[in-house]
């Protein structure tokens, strides 16, 4: 038995937690460089604002003065996400973190202790108490059905935010009301083909022939059908699989033409990638840098390139990774272009910093490297300040545009909200 716990309109909810004056008002969050809408409050949805809609389009609408807009505050969202997951860990037997705002919960044996819906409300209330965020809870025998139940919990207010779909009759009634496009893992393209075969609802899909589904689609969709029938095909993954690569990349707030600006950006991306690498307790062997101009720019020749540097000893020391990244940058930089995007990629991971060397290699790891990196990470996470490397520069004119950024309420002492 599974529960899927999902925060309602996560990004906008994170913003309104610290701005109670915005409760009940239309709020949206925009993507990198304040480009497109990536999160909407219920009130914003009711105005017809669509997900992915360019921000400049809603600026000129008659209702624009009533909308509260925020740039993406990833530090705030990550911190609140961690608090939500920690709360679920403390109240549940085991969980699988599925994304930044949702997690599957293992409810095996819970029926012997209390009604499943009661436990769902308990989780919901505890998350609200600890974080101020409202979640929806869907409960069922399989992950796919739990997703369906969660969809219903968030769609119909009468449910109170919790739907227990363990009853087969309730499953069939809900599936009959659910478009096949809304089933987990089925997008617009697959749903169109299913519609052409007369499969329009989740119930139609659940009652389809497994042989027909496997013939016209694949084993993944067959597994979805089995899950809709209550047959568990997907297990709870308590431990995330080890990452095969780490990418840190952003589009720039404006086109970069100077090497010094690009150098600062690459140093900053290398530092962030190194932090992520250490959080995974991994070491990398290859550091790659890519950059490119806009393929859509008028009267400009497109240029894009990538270069990699192999470290002799796998490392997660920011100094080593910055050094390799800047060496790679020198190999791909070409003057005369207006660059719109660049990034750093780390690959070839090791679980420790030891690798086989050639007989005459005398390279060794930096002394006290692990202790220094741990100290820097702790200081940067504490909110007491930010330690950065000189190559990143001070005035980051290349940084992505975030003109409507909210304070770092939970990660910076100077931004702590004052209780009144």
Label every model-predicted segment.
Residues 1-226, 235-236, 363-420:
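Gly/Gly-Pro- and Ser/Thr-rich, intrinsically disordered tail segments characteristic of DNA damage-repair
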Residues 103-109, 306-312, 356-359:
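Short, hydrophobic beta-strand segments
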Residues 327-382, 387:
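C-terminal hydrophobic structural anchor segments
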Residues 98-102, 140-143, 282-286, 337-341:
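Short Gly/Ser/Thr- and Asp/Glu-enriched loop/turn motifs at secondary-structure junctions
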Residues 23-25, 133, 283-287, 305-307, ...:
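A generic structural signal for short beta-strands and their flanking turns/coil linkers
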Residues 109-110, 142-146, 292-297, 346-352:
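Short, internal active-site loops enriched in acidic
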Residues 182, 192-336:
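DNA-contacting surface of Y-family translesion DNA polymerases
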Residues 300-302, 354-357, 400:
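Short conserved micro-motifs at the rims of enzyme active sites and ligand-binding pockets
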């Amino acid at each position: 038995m599974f529960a899927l716990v999902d925060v309602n309109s996560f990004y906008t909810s994170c913003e309104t937690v610290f701005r109670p004056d915005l409760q009940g008002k239309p709020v949206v969050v925009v993507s990198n460089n304040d480009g497109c809408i990536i999160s909407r409050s219920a009130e914003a949805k009711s105005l017809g604002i669509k997900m992915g809609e360019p921000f400049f389009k809603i600026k000129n609408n008659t209702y624009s003065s009533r909308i509260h807009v925020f740039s993406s505050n990833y530090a705030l969202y990550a911190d609140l996400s961690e608090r939500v997951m920690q709360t679920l860990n403390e109240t549940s037997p085991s969980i699988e973190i599925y994304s930044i705002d949702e997690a599957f919960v293992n409810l095996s044996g819970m029926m012997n202790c209390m009604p499943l819906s009661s436990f769902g409300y308990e989780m919901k209330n505890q998350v609200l108490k600890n974080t101020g965020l409202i979640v929806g809870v869907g409960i069922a025998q399989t992950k796919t059905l739990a997703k369906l139940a969660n969809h219903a919990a968030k769609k119909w207010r009468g449910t109170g935010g919790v739907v227990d779909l363990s009853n087969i009759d309730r499953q069939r009634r809900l599936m009959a009301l659910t478009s096949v496009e809304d089933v987990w893992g089925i997008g617009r393209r697959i749903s169109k083909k299913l519609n052409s075969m007369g499969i329009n609802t989740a119930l139609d899909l659940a009652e389809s022939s497994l042989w027909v589904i496997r013939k016209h689609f694949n084993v993944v969709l067959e597994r979805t059908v089995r899950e809709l029938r209550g047959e568990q095909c997907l297990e709870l993954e308590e431990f995330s699989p080890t990452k095969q690569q780490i990418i840190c990349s952003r589009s720039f707030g404006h086109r970069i033409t100077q090497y010094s600006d690009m150098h600062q950006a690459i140093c900053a991306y290398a530092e962030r990638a190194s932090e992520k690498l250490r959080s995974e307790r991994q070491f990398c062997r290859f550091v790659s840098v890519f950059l490119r101009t806009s393929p859509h720019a008028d009267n400009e020749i497109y240029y894009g390139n990538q270069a990699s540097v192999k470290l002799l000893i796998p490392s997660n020391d920011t100094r080593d990774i910055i050094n390799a990244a800047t060496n790679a940058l020198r190999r791909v930089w070409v003057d005369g272009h207006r660059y719109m995007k660049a990034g750093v990629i780390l690959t070839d991971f090791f679980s420790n910093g030891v690798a086989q060397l050639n007989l005459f290699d005398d390279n060794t790891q930096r002394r006290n490297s692990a202790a220094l990196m741990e100290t820097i990470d702790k200081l940067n996470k504490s909110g007491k300040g930010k330690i950065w490397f000189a190559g990143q520069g001070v005035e980051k004119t290349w940084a992505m545009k975030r003109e409507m950024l909210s304070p770092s309420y939970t990660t910076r002492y100077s931004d702590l909200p004052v209780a009144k």
